[in-house]
Curated annotation (Swiss-Prot):
Short name of any one Pfam family annotated for the protein: UBA
Localisation per UniProt entry: Endoplasmic reticulum membrane
Biased composition (Basic and acidic residues): 286-296
Extracellular compartment spans: 35-91, 143-162
Gene coding for it: UBAC2
GO cellular component: endoplasmic reticulum membrane
Protein name (Swiss-Prot/TrEMBL): Ubiquitin-associated domain-containing protein 2
Alphabetical list of PANTHER family matching this protein: RHOMBOID-RELATED PROTEIN, UBIQUITIN-ASSOCIATED DOMAIN-CONTAINING PROTEIN 2
Entry keyword Membrane: yes
Cytoplasmic side: 112-123, 184-344
């Protein structure tokens, strides 16, 4: 996965692990062995409205009856486990509870709106825990920094978030009316993430409930700390931990900028400089913003590089050109430049 979600695995993410294992196992059993029980997990809106089978709002919105939806939603939950590590299990479960409740309301409203505006009668929707999964795209888009990983054809950027969006698009196109679940999930995610009408205070998991689950279920779904990864020191306070996380993301962004500089240098070393013939969109945007004034005059002078640091990198076996690029991009930070050169 391209997403920067900390350590691999499900360490410090017991709720995400339970959402991966339990619904997926039930979905596989219903598909392979107990097909005659699938009717109890169908998201039948007609039965809810006409026969007042309110229990279908619960059963029909937890277990996926399509294995493709199970697979895609499981991958997305695995990527979104970063929010449980960041917020804690209680706050993460409160977000899922609020998004799940609000999306149930928006499902019914959107179905009625589709029938009133477009004349489309929708009697059933895809089953599964899909509303909260789509709702998690809201904090993912707002709070996870975009770090470039590579480029395709020199213009299409592949970032640490690209694969997650592709999975969301695959899930969106897996059913005919799943767009209603996606739209209701996004709306509920916006409402909860923006604290509209203080829903985060109303739809939350009480502390005593969180303690009960932490005593009973958390030991079952907790994962051991990865032993094959380099241990990173953790600050004693939340502010220090947040600062450490921001420093790590700054280093990732800086390294992606260095990689972009190296690719541009390789492109300019070819027979045709395609950047001069077809400038990237961000350069065109800057030119339009500056009213087509030449940008060469406003370009800041390059950062002066210490020859002593260049010599130290060359002693390690790196070329002078690579050492200069890494030091310029890292503002003469020898450690960051060395880490980048060792990884590329």
């Amino acid at each position: 996965m391209f997403t920067s979600t900390g350590s691999n695995g499900l360490y410090k993410a017991p709720l995400s692990k339970s959402l991966l294992l339990v619904p997926s196992a039930i979905s596989i059993l219903l598909t392979l062995l107990f097909q005659h029980y699938q009717k109890f997990f169908a998201y039948n809106l007609q039965a809810i409205k006409e026969d007042f089978q309110i229990w279908r709002l619960v059963c029909g919105r937890v277990i996926c009856l399509d294995l493709k939806d199970t697979f895609c939603s499981s991958l997305l939950i695995y990527n979104f486990r970063i929010f449980e590590r960041r917020y804690g299990s209680r706050k993460f479960s409160s977000f899922l509870l609020g998004a799940w409740t609000l999306s149930a309301l928006f499902d019914l409203l959107l179905v009625e709106a589709a029938q009133y505006v477009f004349g489309i009668t929708i009697n059933s929707l895809p089953s599964g825990f899909l509303g909260p999964v789509f709702a998690l795209f809201v904090p993912f888009y707002c709070s996870i920094p975009r770090v470039q990983v590579t480029q395709v054809l020199g213009y299409f950027s592949i970032t640490n978030k690209t694969l997650v969006y592709i999975l969301g698009l695959q899930l969106l196109t897996s059913g005919s009316y799943i767009w209603i679940l996606a739209l209701s999930g996004l709306i509920s995610g916006i409402c909860y993430n923006s604290s509209i009408l203080k829903v985060h205070r109303i739809l939350c998991v009480p502390s005593w409930v969180a303690k009960i689950f932490s005593w009973t279920l958390e030991p079952i779904f907790s994962s051991a700390e990865p032993t094959n990864e380099i241990r990173v020191g953790m600050g004693a306070t939340v502010d220090i931990q947040r600062q450490q996380r921001m420093e790590l993301l700054d280093r990732q962004i800086m390294m992606s900028q260095v990689a972009q500089m190296r690719r541009q240098r390789q492109q300019q070393g070819g027979m045709i400089n395609w950047n001069r013939l077809f400038p990237p969109l961000r350069h065109r945007h800057n030119e339009n913003y500056q009213d087509h004034h030449p940008s060469d005059q406003d370009t800041p002078p390059p950062t002066e590089v210490s020859e002593e640091q260049v010599a130290r990198l060359m002693e390690m076996g790196f070329s002078r050109g690579d050492a200069l690029e890494a030091l310029r991009a890292s503002n003469n930070d020898l450690n960051v430049a060395t880490n980048f050169l060792l990884q590329h």
